[in-house]
Amino acid sequence: MSEYSQTVPELVSWARKNDFSISLPVERLAFLMAIAVLNSERLDGEMSESELVDAFREVCKGFEQTTESVAVRANNAINDMVRQKLLNRFTSELADNNAIYRLTPLGMGISDYYIRQREFSTLRLSMQLSVVASELHRAAEAAEEGGDEFHWHRNVFAPLKYSVAEIFDSIDMSQRVMDEQQSSVKEDIAALLNQDWQAAIANCEQLLSETSGTLRELQDTLEAAGDKLQANLLRIQEANMDSGGSELVDKLVFDLQSKLDRIISWGQQAIDLWIGYDRHVHKFIRTAIDMDKNRIFSQRLRQSVQHYFDNPWTLTIANAERLLDMRDEELTLRNEEVTGELPLALEYEEFSEINEQLAEMIEKALLIYRQEQRPLDLGAVLRDYLAQHPLSRHFDVARILVDQAVRLGVAEADFSGLPAEWLAINDYGAKVQAHVIDTY
């Protein structure tokens, strides 16, 4: 949980004043990692210049570079790393030509990122979460006991700040490294499929399953410990509020809760994204297999034609008679020339003629309301008209009558915004909702 007290302009001015810069080609980076590995084997953490030259010689062998003038090139590399504040040089008057070198925090941080952070395993994560759980439990008990400001700072704030927060940062950094490993696995799978996908299927399956299993184990470990960690953080938060509340503790607990939520959610998100990638790879492989069937057939056919005189062959062709489609494209869904008898009421007229007659009759009947300026109760009029017609015509009659009525005028009640009452217009459940038309 890093906190930066400097502002951006202050940091920019500081970097410019000290002329900070880092340039690490792959050879220099390998040299730095070699120094870190050899340095970890020493109890004092110090290395002489001759030992650094030997390490540089091993790096040159690894890159198949010439061993001529190794001492000069090693001296240039050492001086460059001292200038970039990756190494500290210590000299004395008694041994001017035998300086001692130690890695700086920057050099240790870079080498640690490329070496130790790669060792991201379920066991390491479990140990980190176990330490965090123990620290949080002790801090929660100390918070519930209460005490003065010194007690809160020593037994609650300090463990959260310098132990729990740093382990959370380490887990977060490890998860970011895991993201890079997933990207590296994707690149390996793409390279395998581009070379020879048939031989690469087994390797791709192994890479996919190993990564999926690792992500699943890590997520199970996080979920198992996440609830307990959150519970202890809530205990500390409640005890802090009951005791009057320390702003530093409250802010730190909130930051830790956010960090823990982000750590746990990372696992599930990584699993979901990897499942999607897994499906994409398998779909690609299936498509490649389907395409390769045709490619193999065409290749074998081409070879057979080329070597026909050496290995004659016969080709048997099966040509079945073509099936003709006898459907009529102009055939309508419903034949107009239907058989059967029409009802007597419809025997002499078409449907459109009925609608025209109804429209004329209703229009003439409704004109009386406009001429006499009488209010038109649409519900009552509809009920009277529908009673004069069979049920089969109720819908058409109602539609025509409403269409003619709204052409005559409007209802003042429509502008009030109040809904009209539902009125029954026949004995079969049909209803209408309309205000009385009173303005023509």
From Swiss-Prot:
Keywords annotated in UniProt: Calcium, Cell cycle, Cell division, Chromosome partition, Cytoplasm, DNA condensation
InterPro entries: Chromosome_partition_MukF, MukF_C, MukF_C_sf, MukF_M, MukF_M_sp, MukF_WHTH, WH-like_DNA-bd_sf, WH_DNA-bd_sf
Region: Leucine-zipper, residue numbers: 208-236
Keyword Disulfide bond annotated: no
Keyword Transmembrane helix among record annotations: no
Annotated GO biological process: cell division; chromosome condensation; chromosome segregation; DNA replication
GO cellular component: cytoplasm; nucleoid
Intracellular or extracellular location(s): Cytoplasm, Nucleoid
Pfam families listed in its UniProt record: KicB (PF03882), MukF_C (PF17193), MukF_M (PF17192)
UniProt main location, coarse: cytoplasm
GO molecular function, one term: calcium ion binding
Subunit structure: Interacts, and probably forms a ternary complex, with MukE and MukB via its C-terminal region. The complex formation is stimulated by calcium or magnesium. It is required for an interaction between MukE and MukB.
UniProt-listed HAMAP family: MukF
Physiological role: Involved in chromosome condensation, segregation and cell cycle progression. May participate in facilitating chromosome segregation by condensation DNA from both sides of a centrally located replisome during cell division. Not required for mini-F plasmid partitioning. Probably acts via its interaction with MukB and MukE. Overexpression results in anucleate cells. It has a calcium binding activity.
Similarity field: Belongs to the MukF family.
Protein's name according to its UniProt entry: Chromosome partition protein MukF
Organism annotation: Photorhabdus laumondii subsp. laumondii (strain DSM 15139 / CIP 105565 / TT01)
Origin organism lineage: Bacteria, Pseudomonadati, Pseudomonadota, Gammaproteobacteria, Enterobacterales
Protein's gene: mukF
